[in-house]
């Protein structure tokens, strides 16, 4: 079933290479099992599915299927190159080398050196880190089968390194899940208490959100602006971070959800904003224009916080469909490959410049050159990502 999902979600019309990689990986991992007792092949299959869901090219999906064969079986880089080409072999080699990084949560020098190595791997081919993120995400999804000590170690490593890198790459789909899974194992009591509290309020909140969505949708429609309007709950780690940083209870956190408006053009974004500000009173100082001033990870949207019908503040985010894709998939949305019908099925890069793909990376590489001190490098990186504050990470 997983193999069918991987093929179904792949954007490639040429699935023969993916099928071949599956059979090679299955045979190479024959007799190996995960801690869960499942056949080992389930893991690379799930990694490949995550990559296919990001709509990456077939070479990346193939490398995802093969990412553990060099480290865990007798298969060599040379054999991979011979069977699947140099491009796939280089991707697998890059992921293998990243898997050999040491980690020590208490040593800044070790963390900084690991991040430097990751950035160098990204500079060679960003797809290496995308495979590694997919690998880490599936490992976090199955972390319950590890010992409690290993759970905390992997969760800490994920929160300290992998979630921030997903944030830097703008891949919110992966970043959010890594954050929530890390919190689940680092602070289980707080996590399950939060899940319970939110579940208790779910029916009332859902009714309120649906009413707001319908009101907004109707007003936007009346203004002649084609739009998709929906409501979404904020993820657990985001809520927990606010509760800790602001010393508040769940009932004191007002933005547990956001209304999202997706339109066709930038012009429609600002037109929709005008409609919204006529409907509800905006809270001064709570408007952010990330369209005019995008975040370093390419995120663009208009954010505004308003007073709702019951007097409760709520947030609305407005973006185009293209901006929404970038918000969900980040750098992966700019690393897509299309299959050309007139070139024998060879993948060709889409018309996205290297400048667009790697603008975020150049800044970090410049920091690396400028930072002679590892502690200074980590301090600057952490402050930029805004995900490493002492308040958030003083877990026991």
State the predicted function of each range.
Residues 1-4, 8-259, 263-314, 320-383, ...:
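Active-site helical microenvironments for divalent-metal-assisted chemistry
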């Amino acid at each position: 079933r997983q193999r069918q999902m991987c093929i179904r979600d792949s954007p490639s019309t040429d699935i023969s290479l993916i099928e071949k990689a599956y059979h090679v990986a299955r045979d190479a991992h024959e007799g190996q099992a995960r801690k869960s007792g499942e056949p080992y092949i389930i893991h690379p299959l799930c990694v490949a599915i995550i990559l296919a869901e990001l709509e990456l090219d077939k070479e990346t999906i193939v490398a995802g299927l093969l990412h553990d064969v060099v480290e865990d079986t007798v298969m060599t880089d040379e054999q991979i190159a011979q069977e699947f080409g140099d491009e796939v072999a280089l991707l697998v080699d890059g992921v293998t080398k990243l898997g050999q990084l040491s980690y020590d949560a208490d040593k800044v020098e070790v963390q900084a050196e690991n991040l430097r190595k990751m950035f160098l791997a990204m500079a060679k081919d960003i797809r290496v880190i995308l495979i590694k993120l997919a690998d880490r995400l599936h490992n976090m999804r199955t972390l319950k089968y590890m010992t409690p000590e290993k759970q905390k170690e992997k969760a800490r490593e994920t929160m300290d390194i992998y979630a921030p890198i997903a944030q830097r790459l703008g891949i919110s789909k992966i970043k959010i899940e890594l954050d929530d899974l890390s919190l689940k194992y680092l602070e289980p009591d707080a996590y399950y208490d939060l899940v319970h509290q939110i579940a208790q309020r779910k029916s009332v909140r859902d009714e309120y959100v649906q009413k707001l969505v319908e009101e907004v949708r109707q007003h936007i429609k009346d203004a002649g602006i084609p739009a998709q309007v929906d409501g979404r709950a904020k993820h657990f780690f985001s809520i927990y971070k606010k509760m800790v940083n602001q010393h508040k209870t769940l009932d004191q956190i007002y933005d547990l959800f956001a209304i999202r408006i997706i339109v066709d053009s930038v012009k429609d974004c600002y037109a929709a904003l005008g409609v919204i500000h006529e409907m509800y009173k905006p809270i001064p100082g709570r408007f952010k224009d990330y369209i005019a001033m995008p975040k370093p990870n390419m995120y663009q949207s208009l954010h505004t916080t308003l007073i709702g019908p019951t007097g409760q503040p709520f947030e609305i985010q407005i973006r185009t469909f293209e901006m929404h894709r970038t918000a969900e998939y980040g750098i992966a949305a700019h690393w897509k490959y299309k299959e050309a019908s007139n070139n024998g099925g060879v993948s060709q890069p889409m018309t996205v410049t290297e400048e667009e793909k790697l603008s975020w990376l150049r800044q970090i590489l410049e920091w690396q050159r400028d930072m002679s001190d590892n502690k200074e490098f980590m301090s600057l990186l952490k402050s930029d990502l805004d995900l490493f504050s002492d308040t958030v990470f003083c877990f026991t």
